[in-house]
Amino acid sequence: MEKLTILLHVAAVLMSTQALIQEQRQKAKINLFSKRKPSAERWWGDNGCSLWGSCTVDAECCLGNCGGMYCSLLR
């Protein structure tokens, strides 16, 4: 009976250790994915500029070329 109790304690410690390690791995994966940016955001940055949206000044366009009412893709 005593051996069975010791065996159950060892099994409980091993299972809790495994659960703790898996939890840390999940947190690491979440941190990895949260740092990644979508492709468009990596390419154009996150400065709120527009490719072909409406504009009033050059600074509102990603390419810095406001064609009067809309951003121009040509410089």
UniProtKB/Swiss-Prot annotation:
Tissues expressing this chain: Expressed by the venom duct.
Q: What InterPro entries does the database record attribute to this sequence?
A: Conotoxin
Cellular localization per UniProt: Secreted
The alphabetical list of record keywords is: Disulfide bond, Ion channel impairing toxin, Knottin, Secreted, Signal, Toxin
Cysteines joined through disulfide linkages? C49-C62, C55-C66, C61-C71
Q: Which organism is it from?
A: Conus victoriae
Q: What is its main location?
A: secreted
Q: Which residues form the propeptide?
A: 20-41
- Is Nucleus among the key words of this record? no
Record comment regarding domains: The presence of a 'disulfide through disulfide knot' structurally defines this protein as a knottin.
| Signal peptide location | 1-19
Similarity section: Belongs to the conotoxin O2 superfamily.
Q: What is this protein called?
A: Conotoxin Vc6.15
What are the protein's GO molecular function terms? Answer: ion channel inhibitor activity; toxin activity
Give a short account of what the protein does.
Inhibits voltage-gated ion channels.
